[in-house]
A protein has these predicted regions:
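A short amphipathic beta-strand at an alpha->beta junction
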Residues: 113-121, 330
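The substrate-binding groove and active-site-proximal loops of carbohydrate-active enzymes
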Residues: 86-94, 144-149, 306-307
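Short, basic/hydrophobic alpha-helical segments
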Residues: 99-113
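Short catalytic/ligand-binding loop motif for oxyanion handling, primarily in non-cytosolic enzymes
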Residues: 76-80, 93, 118, 125-130, ...
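Catalytic phosphate/metal-binding cores of nucleic-acid and nucleotide-processing enzymes, i.e., regions
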Residues: 82-84
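Active-site/acyl-donor-binding loops of N-acyltransferases
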Residues: 2, 13-16, 124, 128-196, ...
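A conserved beta-strand-loop-helix scaffold within acyl/acetyltransferase catalytic domains
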Residues: 8-61, 65-79, 123-126, 150-153, ...
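Aromatic (often tryptophan-rich) hydrophobic motifs at membrane interfaces
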Residues: 104, 259-378
Length: 390
C-alpha cells in the first residue's frame, strides 16, 4: 500500500467488469487506453495467462486511478514468467512520483512469478507533421535526421524517470531506428479528428489522395461493413498483400476470428471489417477498432488486380468519416517505418499514410526491467537471447 496525497493506494486483482467501468469513466477515458489494454485482448492472445490489476484508494469498490492488463508467458522449463503489458499500463504518466503505483505493480508481478516486465508507456516522444516530411525525403534519410515538429516534454520526462529506475528501452535509443526490439510499432501515424469538420479532413488529404478517392467513386467502388463471415476473404487478401509487399504478420484466420468475437463481445461494434467491392468482387478489406474516443486502422489487405480503381483509398476515406461520426478525437493508422528514402521498399507505406495529412508520432516504445535477484537477471538474459534467435 502506497499513499496518494492523504489517501493510501492499494493494488490488487480486479474483475473485468470493474476494469471496464474504469475505462469508461471520465478519469479512465482521460488516460486514453488502447485496445491492447482492454480485458478482451486477453482472450485474443493464446499461450499467455492474463492478470487484470487495478490500483487506487479502493480498487475493489471501483475507486481506481489506474489499471493494467498483464500477459504472462511461462519461460520453458521453469515456473517463472515474462510479464508483458502491451501499450500499458493505463496510468497517469504525468505523476512525477511513478513509484507510488509502479512499485506495487512490480512487487505484485514478482510475487506472481515474473522474472522480468515489459511495458509500453503511452506518452509520445516526438511528432513530425506530414507537410514537414514530404519535401525532406532522400537517399539514406530517416526520421531521426529531421528536426521534429514537436518534442513532447512529458515523454522526455517519463523516459528519464524510467532510466533512473533501471528500465531499458527495447531495441535501444538509436536515432531513427524502427524499434526492432519492440513488439508494437515505435512509430505510428495519427490523423487528428478533434475540432475538425469533414470538409477539413477532405482538405487535409493531398491532391493524389483526393484524386484517388474521386476515382474510386467514379468507378463505382462500393464500401460496406462486413461481418465475421467475411473474415476468410479478408485473410485470403492479406496473404496476397504479404506476398506482394514482402512482409509476414503470421496471423491465421482463427486469430482474426478470435479477435473479432472477443472485441465485439466486449462491446458490439468495437471491431469492424470494411470491404471495398467493385463489379461484385471484394478488392480490399481493412479492420477498424474503436475504444473510447480513439479509432485504429489495424490491418489492411488488397488484391493484386484492378488496383487502378483505388479500393484502399475509398476504404480509408470511409473509415475516417465513420471514426469522425463516432466522435473519435484521433484516427490511428498504426505503424510506419522510419525511412524517408524513396528507394527503400518500406517507404511506400509511409508515403501512402502521409497523404492523409496527419503526422508521424514516435512513441516512447517498449521498456523492460528484470525483477530483483541474480536468478531473475539470468533468466532475463536467456529470454533476450531466445527472442533474438526467433
Amino acid at each position: 500500500v502506497r499513499p496518494v496525497g492523504n489517501r493510501p493506494v492499494t493494488l490488487c486483482p480486479i474483475t473485468a467488469r470493474t476494469y471496464r467501468a474504469f475505462l469508461a469513466s471520465p478519469r479512465g477515458t482521460a488516460l486514453g487506453a488502447g485496445f491492447l489494454q482492454c480485458p478482451s485482448w486477453a482472450d485474443v492472445k493464446e499461450g499467455w495467462r492474463a492478470l487484470l490489476l487495478g490500483w487506487g484508494p479502493d480498487p475493489e469498490a471501483g475507486e481506481l486511478t489506474g489499471v493494467a492488463l498483464v500477459l504472462l508467458r511461462q519461460f520453458p522449463g521453469t515456473r517463472k514468467y515474462f510479464a508483458y503489458l502491451p501499450e500499458g499500463p493505463v496510468a497517469d504518466w504525468r505523476d512525477p512520483d511513478v513509484d507510488r503505483w509502479l512499485g506495487p505493480l512490480l512487487e505484485h508481478l514478482r510475487r506472481a512469478g515474473a522474472f522480468a516486465v515489459r511495458i509500453g508507456p503511452s506518452p509520445a516522444y516526438r511528432r513530425w507533421d506530414a507537410a514537414l516530411l514530404k519535401p525532406l525525403t532522400g537517399p539514406g534519410r530517416r526520421l531521426g535526421d529531421v528536426l521534429a515538429s514537436e518534442v513532447d516534454p512529458l515523454g522526455t520526462a517519463v523516459a528519464e524517470r524510467l532510466r533512473a529506475r533501471g528500465w531499458s528501452r527495447c531495441g535501444g535509443d538509436g536515432t531513427g531506428d524502427d524499434g526492432g526490439g519492440d513488439a508494437q510499432p515505435r512509430y505510428v501515424f495519427h490523423v487528428p479528428l478533434a475540432g475538425r469538420t469533414t470538409d477539413d479532413l477532405w482538405a487535409g488529404l493531398n491532391q493524389e489522395w483526393r484524386r484517388n478517392v474521386r476515382r474510386a467513386q467514379k468507378e463505382g467502388v462500393e464500401v460496406v461493413v462486413g461481418s465475421a463471415a467475411d473474415l476468410p476473404e479478408f485473410c485470403r487478401l492479406l496473404a496476397v498483400t504479404e506476398r506482394r509487399d514482402g512482409f509476414r504478420l503470421g496471423r491465421s484466420l482463427a486469430y482474426y476470428e478470435r479477435q473479432y468475437a472477443a472485441l465485439n463481445a466486449e462491446e458490439p461494434g468495437r471491431m469492424k471489417l470494411y470491404l471495398a467491392r467493385h463489379q461484385g468482387e471484394i478488392l480490399a478489406a481493412h479492420t477498424l477498432i474503436t475504444v473510447g474516443r480513439r479509432a485504429w486502422y489495424q490491418t489492411g489487405a488488397s488484391a493484386d488486380h484492378r488496383r487502378e480503381v483505388r479500393p484502399s483509398n475509398a476504404l480509408q476515406w470511409r473509415m475516417l468519416l465513420d471514426a469522425h461520426a463516432l466522435g473519435a478525437d484521433m484516427y490511428d493508422m498504426r505503424g510506419v517505418p522510419s525511412t524517408l528514402d524513396p528507394g527503400e521498399r518500406a517507404y511506400g507505406l509511409l508515403r501512402w499514410k502521409l497523404g492523409t495529412g496527419g503526422r508521424v508520432v514516435e512513441t516512447l516504445g517498449e521498456w523492460e526491467k528484470p525483477l530483483g535477484g541474480s536468478a531473475n537477471h539470468a533468466l532475463h538474459r536467456a529470454f533476450q537471447a531466445y527472442l533474438k534467435r526467433r
